[in-house]
Amino acid sequence: MKIKFNDVTYTYQQGTPYEYKALDHINLTIEQGKYYAIVGQTGSGKSTLIQHFNGLLKPTNGNIEHDELTIHSKTKDKFIRPIRQKVGLVFQFPESQLFEDNIEREIEFGPKNFGMNVEEVKERAFDLLLELGFPRNVMSLSPFQMSGGQMRKIAIVSILAMNPDVIVLDEPTAGLDPKSRQQVMELFKEIQLKQNKTIILVSHDMNEVAKYAEEIIVMNDGNIIEQVTPKELFRQGSKLEEWHIALPDIVQLQRDIEIKHGIKFKTIALTEKEFVSMYQEWQHHEE
């Protein structure tokens, strides 16, 4: 599924003294099968933007094209419903939305509402839960007897199992332990690569953004100010400070080495493997 924003503006409480423009003439194209990250400081418009992807919010002005359907301010909810099946949105702390007394019923809830094949969804969910380290009797267990990290994984799986074309993730690893963070992020990447899914990640963790995203959308004050690759973004030193975007740890290490040795690497590395190769090449050149 391709999603295209055409001059989209969104205003909260329009026509009242509390009117606030959260999105300002957004033009954006999301291509099928790519991994995007949306970054920017709190209040930049990220959460408002992602709620437009599946029609939870409708543009005040402009429109959004989802393949055959165009959403604008007057589009009725009954026409948006199919979009919500194709675009899965995982909110921050999705475990707070769990309410069924066992995991099987929790997994069934979404597909029943959309008239989907419940057994197929449950089978996909079971496979995903096993991949994330749950026991084989997981479906009969209560989510409320599990740790916060396990509940997060269950909530995420309940969305992934419905097999959306586009998966929108709002800070999906916030509060998780390092092992769970890696498990969840690797699962998203695997789904993108193996199933040609579109991933849209909102995150303040630039280590995750640098490692997984192919394209980064930078937001500030309701505007998109950059849409670039990770390497293009993280070589912009002073602008990153202006936008309140931290460097990934591996890039910060490179900067520290450059300052210490008075050198300048030809490029930047976004992974430990890339950095080791680049550093060894520099050492060899020095010898």
Swiss-Prot record:
It comes from Staphylococcus haemolyticus (strain JCSC1435). Belongs to the ABC transporter superfamily. Energy-coupling factor EcfA family. NCBIfam families: ECF_ATPase_2, PRK13646.1. The keyword Ribosomal protein does not apply. Pfam families: ABC_tran. Keywords: ATP-binding, Cell membrane, Membrane, Nucleotide-binding, Translocase, Transport. One of its GO terms (molecular function) is ATP binding. This is Energy-coupling factor transporter ATP-binding protein EcfA2. ATP binds at G40, Q41, T42, G43, S44, G45, K46, S47. The lineage of its organism: Bacteria, Bacillati, Bacillota, Bacilli, Bacillales.
